[in-house]
Amino acid sequence: MGKLDGTRTLENLMKAFAGESQARMRYTYFASIAKKEGYEQIAAIFQETADNEKEHAELFYKHIVKNVDELPVTIHVDADYPVELRSTLENLKASAAGENEEWTKLYPKFANIAEEEGFKDIANTFRQVAKVEERHEARYLKLAKNVEEGKVFKKDKKVLWKCRNCGYVLEAEEAPEKCPACQHARSYFELFVENY
């Protein structure tokens, strides 16, 4: 593999690193808002996604460190990054839009450029991360729909609900106002899922 110095791939890796780093922080802020609004599970999902973005940023950063001639290096990038901090619903929609841009436009473009410049492993990283971003978008859209339709804590049929605090599980159309076991608020309930 050739060195990255002077390539478009180097700039794209830095853009991706900066974008993922900023997304991580935005999602951390969004988690706090979701928690304040009574959406514990959505807060946890924002935080989990923030952790995913941290890992993506690290992947891109390691490609830079591994493939430049000298460290430290300063890399100039010309890019736009979103600023958003509103309600949980608006934050979910903005997050979905950002994830969509990454997996449909940015990362496929960056992968193609990396491949053209002879960096197949970097191209592969962009493509694999794009697959994750696609799942992030789908999850954010589904959560936004639940918030919009008032279905975060209420469903059309009986389902299993689990308290995120103590693990109590009950079957009902909607989560209770308080957990019968630990007395934590409704905001601590989520759908019970066993996927192991």
Annotated model-derived regions:
Residues M1-Y196:
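Non-heme di-metal
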